[in-house]
């Protein structure tokens, strides 16, 4: 069953690349054509890479791994927070803290400090602190929530990163590379594919494109959680037990995965037709490019 259809990718503008003057020559193999001064990404390749990414994320989470969702640009912040929270994965949608991966021990201390401050009674008089002291601590807590709130349950370095805009998140990419952590990312036409182990050629600037692809990665994580929760087959080593907060999340992702599966069944005919005739897909993509109102990324 298809993870996503060609129509969904077209409707979300995943095929729109940057202007031809802003590109990375290494991305040439992922480009279908040029139209109105901008590149059009080959969605046939995007579909193939999406399937590979989906399988990797599902298996990683099923075996006890964690996917860190990273996207600090405005177009990605909401989708990153919503989808990561939906499947109980950590996320960073504000400023990336230097050393978050390479100096995780220090970050863990800041997380412990945040949880310590959360225990204080800021409204009552039982804390033993003056109003001024409480105000200072409240401001400290708010700052920690903003920068670390998305990784509060991260107890060790993640198994992989999902990144929106590899150029903007170059610090996260560099730290992951130093530690040998696989990177899954959207590759726009100005990106360097050599930095990413699991690329998805696509538009990393449009909100709809970012939301769709992030939702797909979250669905894969949800399916992995469900598999981890199921009884392992005889002779297969059991995965790490689910934490309580993960168990609470299982019901919602399971329902959403089922609903998504039912929706995809109805669209499988369109996908089969698109794959059977690549020329028709190209024509459809160019027609959609004229019809879509969204302006290509600059």
Swiss-Prot record:
GO cellular component: cytosolic small ribosomal subunit
Short name of one Pfam family: Ribosomal_S2
MF-aspect GO terms: structural constituent of ribosome
Keywords tagged on the record: Ribonucleoprotein, Ribosomal protein
GO terms, biological process: translation
Superkingdom per UniProt: Bacteria
Protein family membership: Belongs to the universal ribosomal protein uS2 family.
Alphabetized NCBIfam families for the sequence: rpsB_bact
Name the UniProt record assigns to this protein: Small ribosomal subunit protein uS2
Name of the gene encoding the protein in the UniProt record: rpsB
């Amino acid at each position: 069953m298809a993870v996503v259809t060609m129509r969904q990718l077209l409707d979300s503008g995943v095929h729109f690349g940057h202007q031809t003057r802003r590109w990375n020559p290494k991305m040439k193999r992922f480009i279908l054509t040029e139209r109105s001064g901008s590149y059009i990404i080959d969605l046939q390749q995007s579909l193939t890479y999406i399937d590979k990414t989906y399988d990797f994320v599902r298996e990683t989470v099923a075996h006890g791994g964690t996917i860190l969702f990273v996207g600090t640009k405005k177009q990605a912040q909401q989708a990153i927070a919503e989808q990561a929270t939906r499947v109980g994965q950590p996320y960073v949608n504000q400023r990336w803290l230097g050393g978050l991966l390479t100096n995780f021990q220090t970050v863990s201390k800041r997380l412990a400090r945040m949880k310590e401050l959360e225990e204080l009674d800021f409204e009552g008089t039982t804390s033993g602190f003056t109003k001024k002291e409480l105000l200072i601590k409240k401001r400290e807590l708010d700052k920690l929530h903003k920068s670390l709130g998305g990784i509060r349950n991260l107890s060790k370095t993640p198994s992989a990163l999902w990144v929106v805009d590899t150029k903007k998140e170059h610090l996260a990419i560099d730290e992951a590379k130093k530690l040998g952590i696989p990177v899954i990312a959207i590759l726009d036409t100005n990106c360097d594919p050599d930095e990413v182990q699991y690329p998805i050629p696509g538009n990393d600037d449009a909100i709809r494109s970012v939301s769709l692809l992030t939702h797909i990665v979250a669905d894969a994580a949800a399916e992995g959680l469900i598999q981890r929760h199921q009884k392992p087959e005889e002779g297969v080593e059991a995965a790490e037990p689910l934490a309580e907060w993960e168990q609470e999340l299982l019901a919602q992702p399971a329902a959403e995965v089922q609903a998504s599966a039912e929706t995809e069944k109805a669209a499988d005919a369109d996908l089969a037709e698109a794959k059977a005739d690549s020329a028709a897909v190209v024509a459809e993509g160019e027609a959609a490019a004229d019809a879509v109102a969204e302006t290509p990324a600059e």
